Regions:
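Residue-level marker of beta-strand positions
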Residues: 21-24, 163
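Conserved beta-strand elements of the Class I
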Residues: 43-46
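Short, Lys/Arg- and Gly-enriched loop/turn segments at beta-strand edges
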Residues: 32-41
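Histidine-anchored nucleotide/phosphate-binding helix
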Residues: 54-64
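Reductase modules of NAD(P)H-dependent flavoproteins
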Residues: 74-205
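A short helix->loop->beta-strand "cap" motif at the edges of active sites that frequently abuts
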Residues: 66-70, 143-144
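Ferredoxin-reductase
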Residues: 1-21
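Extended interfacial segments that mediate partner engagement and assembly in macromolecular machines
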Residues: 25, 30-32, 49, 53-55
Length: 205
């Protein structure tokens, strides 16, 4: 069973929202590279907004490898509409932040981490660009490995059109997110890369 979670943000997702049971669509995937599954490390799985659903399968996989006590999901919502929260709870500990303070910590995921004095050895994150930028800075402050899943325009999805390039550090130039770098080691990214992604947030169909 394949479940798709999406936000209406462009022509493609608008067409998705008009589909009904029995309609047929063409699909290409999975594309790019996923997160590395590190053994023996306590992990923060951090999701915000539409970046929450991709973290659920990761929570399941890390639970199978390391056990639920090594999986700490930190999820950021706008309000008390906490989709998928109960499913995350099946695979580890869950801490919630809401923008309006209706549930959990009032604020963002970093506020929740600090308020609850949470600790981990590695960060996996997917969500809005300001969140990713803050998590990159936090990981450098704490000396924690950090993997960020970026949002970018995906025209072809396989890196051929070069529409999804992201600038990296160390003279490596640009990497094609659609082909190689769907999940990036946070320290390899230029700050300008994260800013570039922010300008294209939710623009993918």
């Amino acid at each position: 069973c394949l479940r798709l979670v999406y936000r209406v943000a462009g022509a493609g997702t608008k067409e998705f929202s008009a589909l009904t049971a029995g309609d047929t669509i063409d699909a290409l995937g999975p594309l790019g590279n996923g997160f590395p599954l590190l053994e023996g490390k306590k992990a923060f799985l951090i999701g915000g907004g539409i970046g929450i659903p991709p973290m659920l399968q990761l929570a399941k996989a890390l639970n199978e490898i390391n056990g639920s006590e090594m999986v700490q999901s930190v999820i950021g919502y706008r309000d008390s509409h906490m989709f998928l929260k109960e499913e995350f709870e099946a695979y580890g500990l869950v801490t919630v932040a809401t923008e309006d303070g209706s549930v959990g910590t009032k604020g963002n995921v970093l506020d929740a981490i600090r308020e609850n004095d949470l600790k981990a050895d590695v960060i996996y994150a997917c969500g809005p660009t300001p969140m990713l930028r803050a998590l990159k800075a936090y990981s450098q402050e704490k000396g924690i490995l950090c993997y960020l899943s970026l949002e970018e325009k995906m025209a072809c999805g396989i890196g051929a059109c070069l529409g999804c390039t992201c600038e990296t550090k160390g003279g490596e130039g640009k990497s094609r997110i659609g082909l190689f770098m769907r999940s990036l080691l946070g320290d390899s990214m230029n700050t300008t890369s994260i800013q570039k992604v922010e300008s294209n947030r939710f623009s993918r169909a």
